[in-house]
Amino acid sequence: MKYVVVSGGVISGIGKGVLASSTGMLMKTLGLKVTSIKIDPYMNIDAGTMSPLEHGECFVLDDGGETDLDLGNYERYLGVTLTKDHNITTGKIYSHVIAKERKGDYLGKTVQIVPHLTNAIQDWIERVAKIPVDDTGMEPDVCIIELGGTVGDIESAPFVEALRQFQFKVGKENFALIHVSLVPVIHGEQKTKPTQAAIKGLRSLGLVPDMIACRCSETLDKPTIDKIAMFCHVGPEQVVNVHDVNSTYHVPLLLLEQKMIDYLHARLKLDEISLTEEEKQRGLELLSKWKATTGNFDESMETVKIALVGKYTNLKDSYLSVIKALEHSSMKCRRKLDIKWVEATDLEPEAQESNKTKFHEAWNMVSTADGILIPGGFGVRGTEGMVLAARWARENHIPFLGVCLGLQIATIEFTRSVLGRKDSHSAEFYPDIDEKNHVVVFMPEIDKETMGGSMRLGLRPTFFQNETEWSQIKKLYGDVSEVHERHRHRYEINPKMVDELENNGLIFVGKDDTGKRCEILELKNHPYYIATQYHPEYTSKVLDPSKPFLGLVAASAGILQDVIEGKYDLEAGENKFNF
């Protein structure tokens, strides 16, 4: 097993996740099987109870793991299916060690950070790195490990020490370190001092970088590269220029141009890994396909405007998978994506009194959009604005997609506007109102007292119901009888109201295996009005966009029927690579 660690210095949020994913993707172009692990040095067990405004999106895995958003990047770039164990947190590893101590596994020893916690981290990495994650079912050849946060912070100290020991445990030829640093541009001059200080700090902790990936707003000058190489004790070929590009999908090609993969190939002796000719050819085809697909970002195309009506619009990372699913779909439809970020509260009548400018700007974005999207979320804030946006889409025949909360919002709006039940709402927001007005109810099997890990999580089947041959979403899925998508919710549509809703035109075309829990709703006489209880964005890939999102973009661009008929499929045929 070969290990490539990606760490960061100077500041967090510098792009380690994209660089780690891009490095893994380049490894795949050699025909290698690649897996990935993310280390998050926070005390939370997982990301399930963290605010999206503080830490970005919570990404849900097949096994129900609620993880850091970077695992979504890994799955999208590498075409793999990870597990909750591929995300190591401080809380998770401490709980593991404490549980072992309680069992008596340490035989009366004084349990310490070194060696017990650091050994547990190393054992965890070695165990998880061997888990098959792709369709071959075989053990991976390479494991990419991203160390979250910033090296030097007190939170990451145990993990840095564990990795320092780990490099000797696995051997130099099996361990490489890429350190991502910031090169700011001040008054037109590229400054290297932050990178010099970061590398000095890294070396003082016992880790020596094999490559330094320099993040900069512009292309690095040769004198800057030479200066970093000289003062950081590396060769110029070990300094990689990772400047801003118009799409993160270009980063693998940027690294390829600078021969990063050639250096790692020699440094890790990758030629010692036995590969079949079929695997090598598969890697070459992957690279060719990636170049062809990402090239769509550079072409001049018609623009499709999607109004994203959300609650966490101040931090775009809160909706990272949604953004990526829209990007994947727009590439397939050969359209330029223009997301209009609409804060849901700005659509509400109260906003007209408190801030008329924001109110009119928000409604202008909604009313001029080609399509409207309401993504997932929790809590009552902004829900009335979402209801108004859903009504606008329904009444004005604007393509609409609701996800999780979006499905519940669409149902509440329909119940109020069409059924005439003006007081209808969700038990999540108003638990004390008359139960007959609860359109959305708490699922009976869910623990009401515990927040963390208590939702309906992970990959679950949805079955298309009888007499739904007309359904656009069913056609987008290829007229299959069932689909498997990832879930994350505590509330569901009130089963007692389903018959009345369907009799008035709101059809639940997809339900769970019991036939009672509603998973997909659709309006029959509408260009595209779809909502899902599950989160289809979590399984979207570059060459295989999420079908509900693809339908939204296609309908918004006026090409839905062409997309359903396969006229926008890749000329080369099927996606062999699952990314």
From Swiss-Prot:
Residues annotated as the enzyme's active site: 404 (for gatase activity), 535 (for gatase activity), 537 (for gatase activity)
GO molecular function: ATP binding; CTP synthase activity; identical protein binding
Domain Glutamine amidotransferase type-1: 305-559
Regulation acting on activity, per entry: Activated by GTP and inhibited by CTP.
Catalytic activity: UTP + L-glutamine + ATP + H2O = CTP + L-glutamate + ADP + phosphate + 2 H(+)
EC number(s) given by UniProt: 6.3.4.2
Cross-link (Glycyl lysine isopeptide (Lys-Gly) (interchain with G-Cter in ubiquitin)) at residue(s): 422
Record CDD domains: CTPS_N, GATase1_CTP_Synthase
Pathway membership, UniProt: Pyrimidine metabolism; CTP biosynthesis via de novo pathway; CTP from UDP: step 2/2
Record keywords: ATP-binding, Glutamine amidotransferase, Isopeptide bond, Ligase, Nucleotide-binding, Pyrimidine biosynthesis, Ubl conjugation
SUPFAM superfamilies, per database record: Class I glutamine amidotransferase-like (SSF52317), P-loop containing nucleoside triphosphate hydrolases (SSF52540)
UniProt similarity note: Belongs to the CTP synthase family.
UniProt xrefs under NCBIfam families: PRK05380.1 (NF003792), PyrG (TIGR00337)
Name the record gives this protein: CTP synthase 1
Organism: Saccharomyces cerevisiae (strain ATCC 204508 / S288c)
